[in-house]
Amino acid sequence: MRVVLLGPPGAGKGTQAQKLAEKLGIPQISTGELFRKNIQDGTKLGIEAKRYLDAGDLVPSDLTNQLVDDRLDQPDTAAGFILDGYPRSVEQAKALHEMLRRRDTDIDAVLEFRVSQDELLQRLKGRGRADDTDEVILNRMKVYRDETAPLLEFYDTEVKTVDAIGTLDEVFARALQALGK
């Protein structure tokens, strides 16, 4: 099963992606984690990505697309994957579609985790990430609204909305139900 998770920063995509990947026996592909690892390792891509992430901006699509394309070449993705944090724009969604077309496959499901803005601010301030300052949080929410929300229109009929308020297990149960599992 090939699944895309959508939702604003702090909606719980990463946590739910881990649980879904475990339950479905497929890898979680998190561009955020891949960027953080590259930043920590001081790679050229990591240094370049850090400049954008520190400002609360999205890493340019060409860098992100290459990272995802390379990851999809790994054998553990053959049976499927959970994409967490990608695609973030219609341009990236089209690139993903092309990557999958080259592999004779497609996305099976798109889950949108929905949370109110007040709840998101509370969650993000409580995570303790160095990059989660008020200014960066508000900019990331604006970037999400401006650039990522149009994905809901792009994926249209494939999108299943998941209410992301509640316990981890409650949200997980809703996500599984949305996937028909």
Swiss-Prot record:
Residues 126-132 are annotated as: LID. The keyword Nucleotide-binding applies. Pathway: Purine metabolism; AMP biosynthesis via salvage pathway; AMP from ADP: step 1/1. Its main location: cytoplasm. Gene3D superfamilies: P-loop containing nucleotide triphosphate hydrolases. InterPro entries: Adenylat/UMP-CMP_kin (IPR000850), Adenylat_kinase_CS (IPR033690), P-loop_NTPase (IPR027417). The keyword Ion transport does not apply. Pfam families: ADK. One of its GO terms (cellular component) is cytoplasm. GO terms for molecular function: adenylate kinase activity; ATP binding. It is found in: Cytoplasm. Monomer. Catalyzes the reversible transfer of the terminal phosphate group between ATP and AMP. Plays an important role in cellular energy homeostasis and in adenine nucleotide metabolism. This is Adenylate kinase. It comes from Mycobacterium marinum (strain ATCC BAA-535 / M). The lineage of its organism: Bacteria, Bacillati, Actinomycetota, Actinomycetes, Mycobacteriales.
